[in-house]
From Swiss-Prot:
GO cellular component: cytoplasm
Designated gene of the protein: trpR
Domain of life: Bacteria
Alphabetic keyword roster: Cytoplasm, DNA-binding, Repressor, Transcription, Transcription regulation
PANTHER family: TRP OPERON REPRESSOR
Function noted in UniProt: This protein is an aporepressor. When complexed with L-tryptophan it binds the operator region of the trp operon and prevents the initiation of transcription.
Presence of keyword Transcription regulation: yes
Name of the protein this chain belongs to: Trp operon repressor homolog
GO biological process per UniProt: negative regulation of DNA-templated transcription
InterPro entries: Trp_repress, Trp_repress_bac, Trp_repressor/repl_initiator, TrpR-like_sf
A Pfam match: Trp_repressor
Length: 108
């Protein structure tokens, strides 16, 4: 038994996920690592970021739309503020492209 945790920081966990993704196994890995509530919270966070980046709704409206508290929206908003405009554009493009790809797969 070692005296410390094998994974001690976020970058190590990201490497683990990247390695699983290279093998096409990121979905089972994340499903195993996260509880249903944690997965639901992550889906909510993705939707929060999407709505905030679109900029069409107030935080209160996003809260009502997604069924989450205003404080949850505020935390997402504060996190977004810590990123550059370029990062925000990249994320919005990724979110839009991922949604489009998902819709294309459903049509097939």
């Amino acid at each position: 038994m070692s005296g410390s945790a094998k994974y001690s920081d976020w970058s190590q966990v990201m490497t683990l996920i990247a390695n699983a993704a290279e093998q096409g196994n990121h979905q089972p890995l994340l499903t195993m690592l996260m509880t249903p509530d944690e997965r639901e919270a992550l889906v909510a966070r993705v939707n929060i970021f999407h709505e905030l980046l679109q900029g069409e709704l107030s935080q209160r409206q996003i809260s009502q739309l997604l069924g989450v508290g205003v404080a949850t929206i505020t935390r997402g908003s504060n996190e977004l503020k810590s990123h550059t405009d370029e990062e925000k554009v990249w994320l919005m493009d990724l979110l839009e492209k991922s949604t489009k790809n998902e819709l294309d797969v459903e049509k097939e």
